[in-house]
Amino acid sequence: MGCRILALEDQSDFVWGHVSARDPDGRGAWMKAATLGFDEIGPEQVILVSWDGEVLEGEGRRHAEYPIHTELLRARPDVASAVHTHAPWSVAFASTGAPLRPISHEATLFVPPEIARFTKTGDLILTSELGVDVAVALGDRNAAFMVQHGIVTCGPDVVTAVMTAVLLERACRTQIRAVGSGGPVTWSSDEEALSKRGNCYPPALLQQAWDYLARQVSAA
């Protein structure tokens, strides 16, 4: 369902982008199979990828950028799911180098402090070494811009990781539109932003938002 929600939220880029979930037995990460779009993914299109990139279970090829997920999960025991997409508003916003501001509720999930940025390369993450670099750039935060590439988000479960990607894209869209209006732009103080984060996005409310989007997917 996470993949289909990302498709609903316009984060598809043909067959590229992925969602992962930590294998409960420690064997690696469950990921969508390559060569398929987010909107095509069901349980049969999910494969288990080992820490070294071997397909252990399921039918299909693994994504070349699996190290984004395996190295992030290795580095962050608190994380059970990661998302990588080429979300268009986020890619456009990150290219400006501007700081993300808490203009909207959505942005308060990420700032303060400033959202992480991975800038070592805008190319594909094809090696474990680059996967480690992404994890280092992310640090202990819930999201990072992969500048000239996409985004990576994470959480203690698939619901949180996916909703974090959804909310980051919406925050970037709001800021681009606000700045593009040509007028002055205001945003919440750090104190208010942190308060809004706690009030707007506790796990129960993220679950409600997920459930709503899941209903939209089912109705489509």
Predicted regions and their residues:
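Glycine-rich flexible loops
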Residues: M1-A220
